Amino acid sequence: MVTSSSSPPLATSQLPVMKGEEKPSNWAELPPDLLSSILLRLSPLEILENARKVCRSWRRVSKDPLIWRRIDMRNLRRLYCIYAMEACCRHVVDLSQGGLLEFNIDQWRFQTTSLLNYMAERSSNLRRLRVKGGQITSVGIFEAIVKLPLLEELELLYCSIEEEHFKTIGQACPNLKTLKLVGFWSHLNESDNDALAIADTMPGLLHLQLISNGLTNIGLNAILDGCPHLECLDLRQCFNINLFGDLERQCLERIKDFRCPNDVLDDYNYVIFSDNGSIEDEKGEEEENYSYGSDDTEYGYRRSADF
């Protein structure tokens, strides 16, 4: 969705109109500022498939790179073909013309190693990156992120990163302030590799989330020593940590917002952990009711020639 995280999608019926004598006779007469405000509330598909087709003025504004500074591609439910997903994502990256600041991609259903690199090579000013997926390789993520020296926020869900890649990422992104890592069931195996890499290379972190990570007390102590500016630390489902004594006191006194391993995931809706230990990806109502076999989108196989 091409919008801030706090702005909900805007349905066609909700499009704002001017009142009284200022109301235009048709959509083509909307002031550019108001039109830009409308498009910023729409998803990439809503712009590409609908909004830009309203009239020439809408198409012209939809090509403005400022419309594409924040791209959210999490919900490409209508693009049932993985090649169409890649094509659409690459197209919106092109439309940003190097001005992309935020990129949010749901990789759960298709491979994005090449897409991530495509985006990174054209978006060196990127500040925030969120990737969700279980197939993309550590090398693929590493090769993309090291091309983003201005990155401030990084969120990786169900992505495996090797220790040496993690360290290089920390060195390549000195402005990193927020890091969120969500694993599968890695907390079942003790491993401080992630924690030690973070402590060694990311001293400027303010917000750190390690959900379902295998770190132990050793890794936690290293993070507390190596990241002295931490304000928020989320260790939910990190069950290899034993909080007691000085370690517990240090966490509670130093960290303004501290989440313990046993704290509930009531504010976390990316994944559902079932009783039998399997992982169930949450689906919205739109996806449940949508048929991926239908061919009602121009992105089914190719991009429209007039855009």
Curated annotation (Swiss-Prot):
Keyword Plastid: no
The keyword DNA-binding appears for this protein: no
Gene3D superfamilies in UniProt: Ribonuclease Inhibitor (3.80.10.10)
Keywords: Leucine-rich repeat, Repeat
Pfam families referenced in this protein's UniProt entry, alphabetically: F-box-like, LRR_At5g56370
Residues in LRR repeats: 108-133, 158-183, 185-210, 212-237, 244-270
Annotated ranges, domain F-box: 24-71
Biased composition (Acidic residues): 279-289
InterPro entries cross-referenced by the UniProt entry: F-box-like_dom_sf (IPR036047), F-box_dom (IPR001810), LRR_dom_sf (IPR032675), LRR_FXL15/At3g58940/PEG3-like (IPR055411)
SUPFAM superfamilies according to UniProt: F-box domain, RNI-like
SMART domains reported in the protein's UniProt record: FBOX
Region feature Disordered, mapped onto this chain: 1-26, 279-307
Ranges annotated as biased composition (Polar residues): 1-15
Name under which the protein is recorded: Putative F-box/LRR-repeat protein 22
Naturally occurring in which organism (per UniProt): Arabidopsis thaliana
